[in-house]
Swiss-Prot record:
GO terms for molecular function: ATP binding; metal ion binding; poly(A) RNA polymerase activity. The keyword Magnesium applies. Mg(2+) binds at D240, D242. Cytoplasmic poly(A) RNA polymerase that adds successive AMP monomers to the 3'-end of specific RNAs, forming a poly(A) tail. In contrast to the canonical nuclear poly(A) RNA polymerase, it only adds poly(A) to selected cytoplasmic mRNAs during oocyte maturation. Plays a central role during oocyte maturation by mediating polyadenylation of dormant mRNAs, which contain 5'AAUAAA-3' sequence in their 3'UTR. In immature oocytes, polyadenylation of poly(A) tails is counteracted by the ribonuclease parn. Residues 88-107 are annotated as: Disordered. This is Poly(A) RNA polymerase GLD2-A. Its cofactor is Mg(2+); Mn(2+). Component of a complex at least composed of cpeb1, cpsf1, tent2/gld2, pabpc1/ePAB, parn and sympk. Following oocyte maturation, parn is expelled from the complex. Interacts with rbfox2 and sympk. InterPro entries: MTPAP-like_central, NT_sf, PAP_assoc.
């Protein structure tokens, strides 16, 4: 468990909104639109001093100089187990200075997190009225803080069970479709073995909560969000966890501000957090800090203020639970692509995010669509001007989509493979989930001379920009063609994947 944590022996859970409001003090009286400016030079200096203060205190405690400790008010969860995790000459610390080939750009680590690339335009804050009390809670599984909180440490309340308090589970229909043929049943069986369990996300969120407590000692008004596949409904038991640290709602310069902040966090993690290992600071187009949590065993990637990742997490989450066939189909396709070596953006193939968008696009473009375009049907729920503290709440009341298309899972998998093997025009079309159809390519630099074009639903960038080599594109197309032929002939999932071995591995976790 985490040293000296107040959550020892229990899961940290959100406060009920009424109690949380009482604990938040003066902040409830402030207008939500007053976005805090946290990035002045004075605040960077103060953040560095905060780190130094806690580091000095830790060293004195470790050396036994208890009587010389200055009278610093320390929160009850201050960590006392401070062992450095990497040495200055270790691969982890020297990795950040490795030079990349000029033709490589930042593909290796940038495209892996391309879903977190923020739009260039600023988010508009039009919310002039304070939020209702029941809307001032954080995202699923997070300690519930108001957006503008007081500097005092958050108060956690012990709960016996979180199933009734956690937003993450209180409105989701997880009913699975009925399988009436062998292939569809195989897909369902594999999906049930692959899908992320409640215990998996709890472990990730415990670490997120601990990290947030530490980070708020440097940036008191910051918020740390779990995003990506861990939260969007398409995660597996072995999915990495993505974290987004939000300091302000406006876009942030990733080369200056975000890099500075991540440098401070890297120092904080290095000097104070003994439960973190394999710490790396990756200086890419979208810089991240990578690390592993010893307690849960989960791998984390932390970025700063790439808020589009929060928005698309909840867009994809809404699609995931809109129709019961979506999640099983997506998870099996992701597993197939990973098994055949075409699901790794750092190696010039497709990111998991791109694969999900491809599946959603296919389901939108059937003669009788299984999915609509949510951004066209419910534009107010996915408005880019919406404040971040409302993003998770807006789509909650979208009803399930009732499609007249009753195609079984097995036929949908076969149809997906056929669509991208022989029907989709890679050279002329752009995949657009936002529009719910394929768009003709323009002469814009984003699409010119690109092998695969998949539009990011919020910022309009190409999520498949990692595929920049003809050889990798040909390999991807060949895998689609080979899989379509094998499944068409055998109607057996074993022709695509070693299902038994995968299920056995998942069950052993």
């Amino acid at each position: 468990m985490y040293p000296n944590s107040p959550s020892l022996g229990r899961i940290p859970l959100p406060l009920p909104c009424e109690q949380q409001q009482q604990a938040s003090g003066y902040s409830d009286k402030l207008p939500v639109s007053a976005a805090p400016e946290l990035l002045s030079p004075e605040q960077f200096i103060q953040a560095s001093l905060n780190i130094q203060k806690h580091a000095n205190l830790s060293r004195m405690l470790m050396n036994g100089n208890v009587l010389t400790v200055p009278p610093v008010s320390s929160p009850p969860w201050a960590y006392l187990n401070h062992s450095p995790l990497i040495s200055p000459g270790s691969p982890s610390s020297s990795f950040q200075n490795r030079k990349r080939r000029s033709d490589e750009g930042n593909v290796s680590y940038d495209v892996k997190r391309q879903r977190f690339h923020s739009p260039q335009e600023q988010t508009v804050n039009h919310q002039a009225v304070p939020l209702r009390g029941d809307l001032r809670c954080s995202y699923p599984g997070s300690p519930a803080f108001p957006l503008l909180q007081s500097p005092s440490p958050p108060v956690l309340k012990e709960h016996v069970s979180n199933s009734g308090d956690c937003w993450l589970y209180d409105h989701i229909d997880t009913t699975l479709p009925v399988a009436e043929d062998k292939l569809s049943q195989q897909i369902l069986d594999l999906f049930q073995a692959l899908q992320q369990q409640v215990c998996d996300i709890k472990k990730k969120d415990i670490c997120r909560a601990e990290l947030q407590r530490e980070i708020q000692q440097i940036f008191p008004q910051s918020r740390l969000y779990l995003v990506g596949s861990s939260l969007n409904g398409f995660g597996t038991r072995i999915s990495d966890a993505d974290l987004c640290l939000v300091l302000k709602e406006e876009p942030m310069n990733q080369h200056t501000e975000a890099t500075q902040i991540l440098g401070l966090l890297h120092k904080l993690f290095y000097t104070r957090l003994s439960y973190i290992e394999r710490l790396q600071f990756i200086r890419a187009k979208v810089p991240i800090v990578k690390f592993r949590d010893k307690v849960s065993g989960a791998e984390f990637d932390l970025n700063v203020n790439n808020v589009v990742g929060i928005r698309n997490t909840f867009l994809l989450r809404t699609y995931a639970y809109l129709e019961s066939r979506v999640r099983p189909l997506v998870l099996v396709i992701k597993k197939w692509a990973n098994h055949h070596g075409i699901n790794d953006a750092s190696r010039g193939t497709l990111s998991s995010y791109t694969l999900v968008l491809m599946v959603l696009h296919y389901l939108q473009t059937l003669p009788e669509p299984i999915l609509p375009s949510l951004q066209k049907k419910y534009p107010e729920c996915f408005d880019l001007s919406m404040q971040l503290n409302l993003v998770h709440h807006a789509p909650r009341n979208i009803p399930p989509y009732l499609s007249k298309n009753e195609t079984p899972l097995g036929d949908l998998l076969l149809g997906f493979l056929k669509y991208f093997a022989v029907e989709f025009d890679w050279s002329k079309d752009i995949i657009s989930v936002r529009e719910g159809k394929a768009l003709p390519r323009s002469d814009d630099y984003l699409w010119r001379n690109k092998y695969i074009c998949v539009e990011e639903p919020f910022d309009g960038t190409n999520t498949a920009r990692a595929v920049y080599e003809r050889q990798k594109f040909d390999m991807i197309r060949a895998e689609f063609l080979k899989a379509w032929g094998a499944l068409r002939d055998d109607r057996d999932l074993y022709s695509l994947l070693p299902v038994t071995a995968i299920v056995k591995k998942m069950n052993s976790l």
